UniProtKB/Swiss-Prot annotation:
Residues 21-185 are lumenal. It is a single-pass type I membrane protein. GO terms for biological process: endoplasmic reticulum to Golgi vesicle-mediated transport; Golgi organization; intracellular protein transport. It comes from Schizosaccharomyces pombe (strain 972 / ATCC 24843) (Fission yeast). Residues 1-19 form the signal peptide. Keywords: Endoplasmic reticulum, Golgi apparatus, Membrane, Signal, Transmembrane, Transmembrane helix. One of its GO terms (cellular component) is endoplasmic reticulum membrane. It is found in: Golgi apparatus membrane; Endoplasmic reticulum membrane. Residues 207-215 are cytoplasmic. The keyword Signal applies. This is Uncharacterized membrane protein C16E9.09c. The keyword Transmembrane helix applies. Its main location: Golgi.
């Protein structure tokens, strides 16, 4: 978590064209993520220093190389820049697509990875044009606005579907109640007709029995 916050702060400094520095511990790379628009040219200088125990200070060494690598994380880590630089050499690359880019720094020396040498790297990066930074911020803000608008549209659609579902449920309930009411009325009518029929038949049988003197 601390490394992520550190990386975010570093990139904030980078794209305000302020020099920062960080340390390499052995052969572990330092990587940072940054959202950048398409066509942004990033330029800068890297300065690598090595700890000198005899002098008890950091000194610049031509034996130190810094490998700078830039990948597009949104395109299966597509590599757009890779270069081995010596101290005070320039970094220069242009983004080919909009999205999150990962910039990694690795310390090397004489073709081998550092195993225990302490290295301090100074980095000063900036975009080629302030307009790009403004455009990037505007694009991010527009993207966020579009997402909010899309969410609002989706929410309205969901609410509309819920209202339609409620209307259908009310219609179904009314239809069901009406059908049940008709069934009950028809059942009552059938019972009444059946009772009347039974009474008439009993009365008819009684008269028949009396007439035939069976009772």
């Amino acid at each position: 978590m601390k490394l992520g916050i550190f990386g975010l702060l570093l990139f904030t400094f980078f794209f305000q064209s302020q020099a920062v520095h960080f340390y390499f511990d052995g052969s572990k790379p330092k990587c940072f993520l940054k959202d950048m628009p398409k066509g942004m040219m990033v330029t800068g200088i890297v300065k690598a220093e090595q700890w000198n125990n005899e002098a008890n200070k950091w000194v610049t060494s031509n034996n130190i190389k810094i490998r700078v690598q830039v990948d597009e994380t949104f395109a299966n880590n597509h590599l757009i820049y890779k270069n081995d630089l010596r101290s005070n050499e320039a970094v220069r690359f242009t983004t080919t697509n909009e999205g999150t880019h990962r910039i990694c720094y690795l310390s090397t020396s004489d073709g081998a990875w550092f195993s225990s040498t302490k290295t301090r790297l100074h980095v000063d990066l900036a975009s080629d044009d302030k307009y790009n930074l403004i455009a990037s911020s505007e694009d991010e803000a527009k993207d966020l606005t579009d997402r909010v608008a899309a969410l609002n549209t989706r929410l309205e659609s969901i609410l509309g579907e819920q209202m339609l579902q409620r209307s259908r449920e009310m219609t179904f309930r009314d239809t069901s109640e009406s059908a049940n009411s008709r069934v009950v009325r028809w059942t009552i009518v059938q019972i009444v007709v059946l009772l009347v029929t039974c009474i008439w038949q009993l009365s008819h049988l009684q008269r028949f029995f009396v007439k035939e003197k069976l009772v």
